[in-house]
Amino acid sequence: MDHSSSSNSCFSVGSTSPGAVVLLYSKELKKWDEFEDVLEERRHVSDLKFAMKCYTPLVYKGITPCKPSDIKCSVLNSEEIHYVIKQLSKESLQPVEVLREEACEILDEMSHKLRLGAIRFFAFALSKIFKQIFSKVRVNEEGIQKLQRAIQEHPVVLLPSHRSYIDFLMLSFLLYNYDLPVPVIAAGMDFLGMKMVGELLRMSGAFFMRRTFGGNKLYWAVFSEYVKTMLRNGYAPVEFFLEGTRSRSAKTLTPKFGLLNIVMEPFFKREVFDTYLVPISISYDRILEETLYAYELLGVPKPKESTTGLLKARRILSEKFGNIHVYFGDPVSLRSLAAGRMGRSPYNLVPRYIPQKQSEEMHTFVTEVAYKMQLLQIQNLVLSPWPLIVAVLLQNRPSIDFDALLEKTLWLKGLTQAFGGFLTWPDNEPAEAVIQSSILLHSNIVSLVKDRVILKMECGDSELVDGLIFQHITLLMCLAYRNQLLNVFVRPSLVAMALQMTPGFRKEDVYSCFRFLCSVFSDEFIFLPGNALKDFEEGCYLLCKSEAIQVMTRDILVTEKGNSVLEFLIGLFKPFVESYQIICKYLLNEEEDYFTEKQYFIRVRKFTSQLLDQGASQCYDVLSSDVQKNALAAFVRLGVVEKKKVNNDYIFNVNEPATTKLEEMLGCKTPVGKPATAKL
C-alpha cells in the first residue's frame, strides 16, 4: 500500500499510530484468477448428470447421524423444553399435555424435511435457470477450500449478505456443486403460503420462523432449541441472514441479534468446543428484483409470496442479469472472538436447561460480533463498473455526453481502487466497450442516443406507471446501484462532509462533526459501535492517500488537488443530509400532537413529493421509505422524536426545539457542539 508523505503526521487526535492505522485499513488485493466461474462446467455437462451425480459431502467429525424426525424428537424430549413447559403450565394454569401438543404443532410448522431428492431437483432446475439469466457465477476457490476444512472441524454458521431471493438458492446450489453439505436455512413464514414451493423449500433444508414471536415464550424456546440441536449435532451448516430481510436499497441493513444469540449459546454452555462463523458476500451486476424494490420504496406494498406470482415472474428468464460474485470469507472462530472478552463461567452457575436473561456484557459482545461480521461482508462485496457509471450519471442528470461519462468514470475507478474498493473491471477490453456493455445490461434505466447517455424518465408517452411517477421509479433504481459504492466511501465522505460543515480547519472540530454525522447516520451505514475515532482515522488516511488533504498537528488542510475529490464525495453523501433536513421540516410542520408509524410514512411521502413537484428540492433519496424509516429511528435515538407504546402500538410526538436544532446543525446554521453525540 502506498504511503503518501502527507499522511505521516496524521493521527494525533487519538493514540493510534499512523503505522497501525495503515495496517488496520490496508486491504489485501483480491486475485481475480483465483475466482472460478461455476457455470462454465455446467454449460458443457448435462444438467441431469449434474443433478444425479454421486453426492457424498464432507461432514463434521463430531456429527450425530440423524433424520429430520429425530431432531424433532430430540427437541421435544430436551430438558430445556420440559422445563419451559412446566414453568408455563404453572404461570398459565394450562395442562402440561396441552402445552406439549402446542410445542409439537410449532415444530411441525417450522421444521425442515431435508431430502436428497429435493436437492437434486433444485440442482437440475437452478442449473438451467442460472445458465439462462447469468453470464457467470464467480466463486473464490480459496474460500471454498477453507469452508471444506471448517465444516469437518466444528459446527459452522453461514452468514450471507442479503440482496435477493436468489441468495439462499445460490448458496445451496454452490455447496452442492462443491460436494459440501447443503445448509439448513432460516426462512420467513411468507414462503409457506406458496403451494408446493413452500414444501419443496422445506425438503431442501429450509426451516421456517415467524417474523415476530410476540412474547410467545414457548415458541421462542422451541425455535431456539431446534436451532441449537442442529448445531450441536453438526447435522448441517446453519444459514441465516444477519440483516433479517432483503435490503431493498442495496445498503447493508443494521443487524438483528436473535439468531446470532441462539447459535452462540452452545459454545458458551460448553456443549461444543467452538463454532465457526462464515461471512459470505453475494454481489449482483443487476438485481432481479430491482423494479419491485423501487415500487416498495415508493410505498407500494410488497406482493404476497405465491406460486402464481412465481409463475408470473417467469418473464425474467428472457432477460440478462450479468454476473454474480460469491465471496466466502475466512471462517471466524467464536472461541477466538470470546478469548479474553467473554468468560463461560456465568453459564456454569445454573443448569444448562434453565434459560438465562442475557447480561449487558453478553449483549455488547453479540452486538460487536454482528457488526464485525457485517463489516467483513461489506469488505468482500464486489463492485462492477455500473455503480460507478450510475454515480456519475446521478451527479450529471438527466444526461451526459458519453466521452465525459467515460472520463469521469475512469477517474472514479482510480479513486475507488485507491480507497480499497473490491472492483471488477475487464482489463482486456477497452474502457468504452466496458461502459457500453454496462449501459446495454441496464437498458431499462438508461439509453445511449447520439453519443449522449440519458436516464429514462418516461414510459412510452406517459409519465405515470401504476399511479407512480416513472421518473421516481428510475431514479430509485439508480440510487440503489449508487448505494453499492457508499460502503467504500462512507468514512472519507463523512470526513469531507465534516470539513465542509465545520467553520475553520481545527482537527478537533472536524472530528466532533464527524462523530455527529456518524451518530445521525448510524442506521444508514454500518459502523462498529464505539469505533468513531478509528473510523475518522481511516477516513483521514484514505483522503491523505489520495492527496486530497494534509493532516497537520492541529489542522486539516485541503490540497489544490483535493477539491475535486471532496466535491465528489460530498455530492455522494449530501442527499442523506438533505433528506434528513427535509424530514425535520416535515416534522416541524406536523399538525397532530401524536402520530403512528403508518401515518408518518403516508404524510412524509406526501410532503416530500410536493417539495419535489414544486421544484423546491432535487433530492430524490428522500422518497425512499428506507431513508424515511432510518431517519425516524435516528430521531428517536437522538431525542428529536419521542416514542411511546399505547395499546400494542407505538405513537410518536415531535420535540420541536430538538428538531429545529438538528435541522440547523445539518444545514450548517448552528455549529456542531461538543459532545456532538449527546441527545439533542
From Swiss-Prot:
Quote the subcellular location field of this record. Answer: Peroxisome membrane
Q: Which GO terms describe its biological process?
A: ether lipid biosynthetic process; glycerophospholipid metabolic process
UniProt-listed Pfam families: Acyltransferase, GPAT_C
**Which pathway does UniProt place it in?**
Membrane lipid metabolism; glycerophospholipid metabolism
Which ranges belong to the motif HXXXXD motif? 162-167
Main location class = membrane
**Keyword annotations of the record:** Acetylation, Acyltransferase, Membrane, Peroxisome, Phosphoprotein, Transferase
What reactions does this protein catalyze? dihydroxyacetone phosphate + an acyl-CoA = a 1-acylglycerone 3-phosphate + CoA; dihydroxyacetone phosphate + hexadecanoyl-CoA = 1-hexadecanoylglycerone 3-phosphate + CoA
Domain topic, free-text comment? The HXXXXD motif is essential for acyltransferase activity and may constitute the binding site for the phosphate moiety of the glycerol-3-phosphate.
Q: What is this protein called?
A: Dihydroxyacetone phosphate acyltransferase
